[in-house]
Amino acid sequence: PEVFIYDHLPSDTRWQLLKKPVTSEDYAGFVRLRPAFFQTGLEIKSHRKGIIEIDDQVIVTLRAPDRAVLMAELLRDEDKLDESYTFIQRQNGSYNIHAITPRAGPYVLRVFSKNRHEEGSYAWALDYRIKAAKGGGGGFPKAFGTFSENGGYLHSPMHAKLKRGSTQVFKIQVPGAEKVAVIMGDNWHHLKKEGDMFIGNIEIQDKHIRVFAKFPGQEQYDGLLVYTGS
């Protein structure tokens, strides 16, 4: 019932089968879901309303089965913005969809989904209308496919641009990885392994900052994330 109420509002509240019936006013404000949302087994977890008012950042959380994979984009005036303004990662049976706005104003956060082993492109699943009070001044780091394919989860740092001379706390969860290193030029800074978590305080010394991981049975490291020193 909690899923179907987004798609259809019974005129008789008894047929909603909900502990707290939804009013017509509530229903009018719900996020509008498209067929792909239901076809990939998604559920709303964090934001039921279709309009989200924020300062400059938001995290939308959707429950999703293991078979579902997501993409997201941020639009302004129907124009797609740079992919660095969204960042998706999976944890505990849900996807966290991070979005940051470059400046104040209205935006659309659009989410696409597909079943993992299905051929074809991602399908439009839902839209949120975002009202931002200000801009966040930069996007998220670039994530390689290896990051999501191995269940990676980035705790920090979340901003793509890191100030040179600053010390940043790198905290990255990479299930199954043997080693994770932050690479700047020829310098490799290996993070401390604590279970699936890799943690370390790293001084930013270069313009090009990459995070790589080594997995069992591999001699070479695979790329996970890319940052920029500014």
Task: State where each predicted segment sits.
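Extended low-complexity, serine/threonine- and proline-enriched intrinsically disordered segments
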Residues: 55-86, 113-115, 171-190
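Surface-exposed beta-loop interaction hotspot
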Residues: 9-14, 18-26, 133-153
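Aromatic sugar-binding surface patches on proteins
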Residues: 84-97, 188-200
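His-Asp-centered catalytic microenvironments across diverse enzyme cores
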Residues: 2-82, 91
